[in-house]
Structures are given as C-alpha cells and as structure tokens.
C-alpha cells in the first residue's frame, strides 16, 4: 500500500500524453493523424480507466483502513520563502477521482459516436483529455497554490470546450461570458489565498487548518479580516459552481457539444466548487458568519434555479438550471455543516444528471435526422413530443434520471436529497420549508421536460405556418414562446393546455395550426423531406434510436443511478452499530471536522421515513401538476361536460390568476429572473459610461492642462517676442510698469495692516 501511495503522483499525468500526441500529430503529420482519428478514443479511455482502477483500489483500502496520506516536495527560494508541491490522498480525493473517471470514461465512449461526423473530432478529444488531467490534478492538490494552478487550467478547458464551435456567434459569446464570469470568482480566490498566507504563513492544508484554528481559539486574529478572506476564497466556488449571483454563465455554456455538458457542467467542473468548499470546510467551520452565508447563498440558488427552469424551451438549458438548483442543495448542506450529506448528493446527482444530459444528447441526435443541424430546432421542446415510440431506450433512461432527480425512492438522489432536507429542519425551519417546496418545483419542471419530449405526438409535424402573419398566442407548450409579446387575442389558458393532441390529422389537408413565428421556416423541410424507403417527398422521416456506443454509456449510468444510493444507506454490522460505506470512508474527514462523531453517525429511521414521506408527497404533487398541464392523456377530459364547466368556472373566477400571475411567472422565468438584464443594463452599461467619462476626463482635462500649458507658453513667448524689438525705451517702459504694479500692491498691503 505504501508503494502505491509513493508513486501516486503519476496518476495526475497519466492521461496527459493524449492531448500532447494529438497536438504533435496534427502539427507534423496532419493527414495521417486525421485519417486515423477514430483510434484516439482508445488511448483516452484506456488511460482514464487506469486512473479509475487505482482510485477504486485506494477507496476500498480507505474503507477497510481509514487514513490520510500526504507527500510534499519543497523548492526553497530563499531562507524565508519556499514553494511546496505534493499530493494529498484522503477520502475526498478518492470520491472525486472515482466520480471524474467513471463519468469521464462513459462520456468519452459516448462522444466517439456523437462527434464522429464533426471536423473537430481530434480537437474535441484533446480538450477532453486535457480537462480530465486538470481535474485529477485539482482534486489531488495538497495546497492552495496547486489548487489555484489547476483551477485556472480547468477554467481554460471550459472556455475551449464551451466555445468548441467557435464559428457560431452564440458559442463564441457563451465561452467569453463563462470566462469573464469565472475570472471574477478566481480573482477573489487569489486574494483569499494571499490573505490566508499573510495570516498563517502557510498554504498547506494541514498547517493552514491547524494554525488558523489555534489563532481563532486564542483570539489572536482579526476575525473581520479573516471572514473577508474566507469569503474571497468562497467566491471562487460561487463562480465555478454557478451559485447566485455568478450563475449567469451556466445556461449559456450549453452552446457546447452535449457530451461536454454531461462531463463538465453536471459531474465534474461545476462540482469543483463543491469540492473546494468541502476541502476548506475545516477552515470555514470556525467562522459562523461564513457558514451562514454559504447556507444562505445555497438556499437562494436552489430556489432561483428551480423557478428559472420553468420557461426554458431548450432541453439543455432546462437541465442547466436544474444543475444550478441541485448545486444549491449541496451548498446548503455545506453551510449547515452536513459534510457527508453534501458529498452524498454530489455523487448521486453527478450520475443522474450525466444520464439526463447524455439522454438529451441522444434526443438531439435523433431530432437532427429530421430538422438538420440546427440547435434552435433540434433542442426545442416545442417541436418534440411522442418520442417514446421512436427512442424507447433513451426514453427509459431519461425517465430513470428524471425520477431520481425528483427524489423518488429507491433511486440515488432520493437518499441524498432527503438527508439534506432532514438536516435543514435542524438548521432553520424557514430554510427547510424552502428546500421542501423546491423539491416539488424540481419534480414539476423535470416532468415538464419529460412529458413535452416523449408524450403525445411529434409536434414538429403537427405545427405548420401559413404566410407572414405573426401569431400572438402561445405555442403548444405553456412556456414555449421565443420572445415576450403582449397577447392581444383573448383566450383562456386552461383550454389551451388541455387541447386534444390525440386527434388524427392528415398532412395532405390544407388545415393550418397556429405556431410561433420563429419556426415558420420549418414549413419547407417538413413537407419536402425525402424518404428513401418510399421514394416520395410526401413521406415523413421520424427520429431514430442512437447507436449502441451511446446507449451503452446511458445504460451504465442508469445502473449507477439505480444503485449508487446503497453507499449511503446504513446497515447493522456484527456489533449492532449502524454504519454505511460512505460514512466509513469519510471517517478521517469527519474526525477532523467534528469531535462528537457518534451523534453524526446515528441514523434515526423513524425521522428519516417521516421526512421522506413529506418530500415524496411534495414531489408526487409536482409530478401530478406537470402531468395535468402537459400530458396529452388529460386532454380527453375536455370531452366531459363536468370538466368543461369546471374549466369555465375557473376561467371566470380566477381570471386574475390566469392572466396575471401565470404570465408574471413566465416572464420571470423566461427572462432569467431579470438578472442578466440587470447586469447588462446597470453593470455593463455602467462600466461603459464610466469608461467614456474617464476617456473624456483624460482627453479634455488631463491632456487639456498639459496642452494648455504648452499653448499658453507659445502665446506668451510670441507676445514677449514682439515687445523685445531692441529699443531701450520699450524695455524701460515695461520695467517701470512692473515696478509701479509692485509698489501699488505693496502700499495697499501696508495700508491694510495699519
């Protein structure tokens, strides 16, 4: 075991040769490298699999014999300063390594087929391998300087991957937005690192925690300054994990390829902020204000992310806001001091969300066979529907991930989320109510995505547009408008939601259906899609199931989603003590954080089942509401007079709710809570106005003074030149004038004092 720890540093660089060899091959042998491009997936998966095997072995050893291993190399600059590099192997490192490698391997296998037709295939795998190397280096770092170095490499990889299709303006803008937003948090992280080095004189985690805790307990540190430094450290986690108010980059980051969203923005990079918070929790836990702030930002983020997911018509953006909300749960757990619950939810959510993103990629892949490569169409929930008949395996996998994220037992996220909800009651009843309510909102928007995608009929073929007349009504989806427009046509919302989508409609009739103007350009391709099987332009193609390599990754992630919760479920050992795998693995970290370990490891089944009943009931209610609004099966109820009279009664009595509250909710959600508008209007425009004022001041005032002195000197010189004409009488006149002026001033001053 000691031998493995001794050479553990090699793990960090195992996958680094892949991007290097791809780069050298493209530079020296471009033709041969591109012709053999599909072979590069094998070394990428192989090297990452080696890291996974080592990580799994280390995790098993730590479960059997809990320990922490630290190795450091010192590079002395002078007698007063030295740089130390090393690696830290503890339970948190093992968990993150297994998470990064398992999801990374499955995403690489998935990407081999998903990106096979892309010209940037080799560039994609080079970026992905370099990103995996950076993440492995980040989680094995033994000090803050190493973390910051790999932190920046991860940010650079994120920039490259989000802007992978850099010729698209939206992708180019998205990667710039992500880069700039994360630089705000990274600048705070750097200042926090420098601040704690000034306080403690060390950046090694072991020394940093010990020295700082002693300073706090002995009241030898300025707590205000220490709190400020801790907040600056946490600012890096806020930006990287898309927490309010630095969350604005995450939905735009969906402009990258879908496998990137699954790896970076579900399982690893956004989880890096949670990792940093967990790594520095021994530092934060002695400062109650910071812990309360972390919990507050977490509760705001989880609620905000859930509400912003309501109106997203892009399937990937909806999942992005879901990620933001679930990361809020993890931040809330860290703020409450629930170290185990935060990491448990980090694990379960990573596999469930990766499954959902890969499922969405399979859906997009199948839709592109109809609409072509057009993200505005292939990712549009309004144009989907009825896909369960065409992509049954994808549908089952997506449903599994959806149920897990909703917190339905016995799937993974049920166990971890309920543990956070249980702890929230002990921390703050208000926070608990918000967290429980958000569980219902999560179930609502996730099943909204599922129902709009898989139930009913393929809306792409049911929606046509005639002429250039602009429709002012809603599309089929409640939250499906492209942009906000005031509705001039009077209609009731509930009859629209329950309209019958099951009616058989012939495409050869001239009957038209109203749809948003933004998809009017689809009328050509929809009508004239050729079908090679029938040889006619009037035959329609339909989505198809993805290739086996893509389905394999989804099936494996589905198994993880089903069974990953087992690691956090307590069982009775031979001594009758309740103990689970995760708690046993985290024993060294729990001992470091808490002295009273026994209370933390006890599991009250009665309390858990009681809270689980509440949470599952709330989630079921959210699913029921989503099914009522979006499931086409409920449209058959409109044929009953009782239901029609009920709808009419609601329309008359709750007109304000229907026309105002729902529209306000839609506007809030569709416009991203007006936060982007606030930044664009006040922050960006304010900076531009300030820069223009500075430019004006520099040109007119600063340059005006210097230029004015020069011009004044010129005119004075010119005036003196004309005075000095060589006549003594002129010189005497000027001399006498200055003397008289001096005497006049002097005499007035003397009289004033007399």
UniProtKB/Swiss-Prot annotation:
Keyword vocabulary terms for this entry: Chloroplast, Membrane, NAD, NADP, Plastid, Plastoquinone, Quinone, Thylakoid, Translocase, Transmembrane, Transmembrane helix, Transport
UniProt entry tagged with the keyword Chloroplast: yes
UniProt keyword annotation of Mitochondrion present: no
Catalytic activity, as annotated: a plastoquinone + NADH + (n+1) H(+)(in) = a plastoquinol + NAD(+) + n H(+)(out); a plastoquinone + NADPH + (n+1) H(+)(in) = a plastoquinol + NADP(+) + n H(+)(out)
Localization per Swiss-Prot or TrEMBL: Plastid, Chloroplast thylakoid membrane
Family: Belongs to the complex I subunit 5 family.
The protein's role, per its UniProt record: NDH shuttles electrons from NAD(P)H:plastoquinone, via FMN and iron-sulfur (Fe-S) centers, to quinones in the photosynthetic chain and possibly in a chloroplast respiratory chain. The immediate electron acceptor for the enzyme in this species is believed to be plastoquinone. Couples the redox reaction to proton translocation, and thus conserves the redox energy in a proton gradient.
Protein name listed in UniProt: NAD(P)H-quinone oxidoreductase subunit 5, chloroplastic
Organism: Morus indica
Lineage, top ranks: Eukaryota, Viridiplantae, Streptophyta, Embryophyta, Tracheophyta
């Amino acid at each position: 075991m000691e031998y493995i720890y001794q050479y553990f540093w090699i793990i960090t660089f195992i996958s680094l040769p892949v991007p290097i060899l791809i780069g050298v091959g493209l530079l020296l042998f471009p033709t041969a490298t591109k012709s053999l491009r599909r072979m590069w997936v094998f070394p990428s998966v192989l090297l990452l699999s080696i890291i996974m095997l080592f990580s799994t072995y280390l995790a098993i050893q730590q479960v059997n014999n809990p320990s922490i291993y630290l190795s450091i190399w010192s590079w002395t600059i002078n007698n007063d300063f030295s740089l130390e590099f090393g690696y830290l192997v503890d339970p948190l490192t093992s968990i993150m390594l297994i998470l990064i490698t398992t999801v990374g391997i499955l995403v690489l296998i998935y990407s081999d087929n998903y990106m096979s037709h892309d010209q940037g295939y080799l560039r994609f795998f080079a970026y992905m391998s370099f990103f995996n190397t950076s993440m492995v280096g980040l989680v094995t770092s033994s000090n803050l300087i190493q973390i910051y170095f790999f932190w920046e490499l991860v940010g650079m990889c994120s920039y490259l991957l989000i802007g992978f299709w850099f010729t698209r303006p939206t992708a180019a803008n998205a990667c710039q937005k992500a880069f700039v937003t994360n630089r705000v948090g990274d600048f705070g992280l750097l200042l926090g690192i420098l601040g704690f080095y000034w306080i403690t004189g060390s950046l090694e985690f072991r020394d940093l925690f010990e020295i700082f805790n002693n300073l706090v307990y002995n009241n030898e540190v300025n707590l205000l300054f220490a709190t400020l430094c801790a907040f600056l450290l946490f600012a890096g986690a806020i930006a990287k994990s898309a927490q309010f108010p630095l969350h604005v980059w995450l939905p735009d980051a969906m402009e990258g390829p879908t496998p990137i969203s699954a790896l970076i923005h579900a399982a690893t990079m956004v989880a890096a902020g949670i990792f940093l918070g967990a790594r520095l929790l021994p530092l934060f836990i002695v400062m109650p204000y910071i812990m309360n702030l972390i919990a507050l930002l977490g509760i705001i983020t989880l609620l905000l992310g859930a509400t912003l997911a309501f109106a997203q018509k892009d399937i990937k953006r909806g999942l992005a806001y879901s990620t933001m909300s679930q990361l809020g749960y993890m931040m809330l757990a860290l703020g409450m001091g629930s170290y185990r619950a935060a990491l448990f939810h980090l694990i379960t959510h990573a596999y469930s969300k990766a499954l959902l993103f890969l499922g969405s990629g399979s859906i997009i892949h199948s839709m592109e066979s109809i609409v072509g490569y057009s993200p505005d169409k292939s990712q549009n929930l309004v144009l989907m529907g009825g896909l369960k008949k065409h992509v049954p395996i994808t549908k089952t996998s997506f449903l599994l991930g959806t149920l897990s994220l909703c917190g339905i037992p016995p799937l993974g996220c049920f166990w971890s989320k309920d543990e956070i909800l249980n702890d929230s009651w002990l921390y703050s009843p208000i926070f608990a109510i918000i967290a429980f309510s958000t569980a219902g909102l999560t179930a609502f928007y996730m099943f909204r995505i599922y129902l709009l995608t898989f139930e009913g009929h393929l809306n792409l073929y049911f929606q046509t547009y005639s002429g250039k007349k602009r429709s002012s009504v809603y599309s089929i989806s409640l939250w499906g408008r492209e942009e906000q427009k005031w509705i001039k046509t009077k209609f009731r919302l509930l009859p629209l939601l329950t309209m019958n989508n099951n009616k058989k409609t012939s495409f050869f009739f001239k009957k038209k259906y109203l749809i948003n103007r933004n998809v009017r350009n689809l009328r050509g391709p929809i009508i004239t899609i050729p079908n090679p099987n029938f040889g006619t332009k009037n035959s329609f193609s339909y989505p198809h199931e993805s290739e086996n390599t893509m389905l394999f990754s989804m099936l494996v992630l589905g198994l993880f989603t089903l069974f990953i919760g087992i690691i956090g479920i307590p069982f009775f050992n031979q001594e009758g003590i309740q103990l689970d795998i995760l708690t046993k693995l985290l024993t060294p970290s729990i001992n470091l954080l808490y002295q009273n370990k026994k209370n933390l490891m006890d599991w009250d089944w009665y309390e858990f089942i009681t809270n689980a009943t509440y949470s599952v009931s709330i989630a079921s209610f959210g699913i029921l509401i989503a099914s009522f609004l979006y499931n086409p099966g409920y449209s058959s109820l409109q044929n009953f007079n009782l239901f029609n009279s009920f709808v009419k009664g609601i329309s008359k009595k709750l007109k304000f709710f229907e026309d105002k509250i729902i529209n306000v909710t839609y506007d809030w959600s569709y416009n991203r809570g007006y936060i982007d508008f606030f930044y664009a209007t006040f922050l960006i425009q304010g900076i531009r106005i300030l820069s223009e004022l500075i430019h004006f001041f520099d040109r007119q005032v600063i340059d005006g003074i210097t230029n004015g002195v020069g011009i004044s000197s010129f005119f004075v010189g010119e005036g003196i030149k004309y005075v000095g004409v060589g006549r003594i009488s002129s010189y005497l006149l000027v001399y006498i004038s200055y003397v008289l002026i001096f005497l006049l001033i002097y005499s007035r001053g003397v009289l004033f004092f007399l």
